[in-house]
Amino acid sequence: MTTFNIYPLDDSLRPTIQSKIDNLNKPKGSLGRLEELALQICLIEQTLSPTLHHPSHLLFGADHGIERERVSVSPREVTWQQMINFTRGGGGVNMFCRQYGFDLKIIDVGVDYDLSSIEGIISRKIAWGTNNFLHEAAMSQEEMEQALGIGRDMVDCCQKEGCQV
């Protein structure tokens, strides 16, 4: 079983941080989810003025077996095409990362296509897509543990590169 050492946030600064956010030159709560995110980042860093150091966005790609039931917006071919598109800077996520200075890591954990030779894609493939959960378990317990481990490893890698968010 995979365990993570994620400690509860120290809430002692919450009232002070919330007051600072509420008293910015804007209507209270007008930034919606962004205000919640700002509060969370301040609590993580335990400061009223957080800074992001080498922020990273991890994009994990995989195909889902239930797609075979035609319930997805797009066919599975779109997954590998989009993964390649992301390496060329053509996705919305690329624009976000460029705009805000985030490092983008594109990780293949289960795309039903061989992307191993594509520069810019980290190959950590567990399987060639998941099973159709309408008929069987989408993944085995072992595959699920492997997927969580890959996520943990990628976060560790980003942290070693100086990323704290």
What are these regions (language model features)?
Residues M1-V165:
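N-terminal loops that bind phosphate or other acidic moieties
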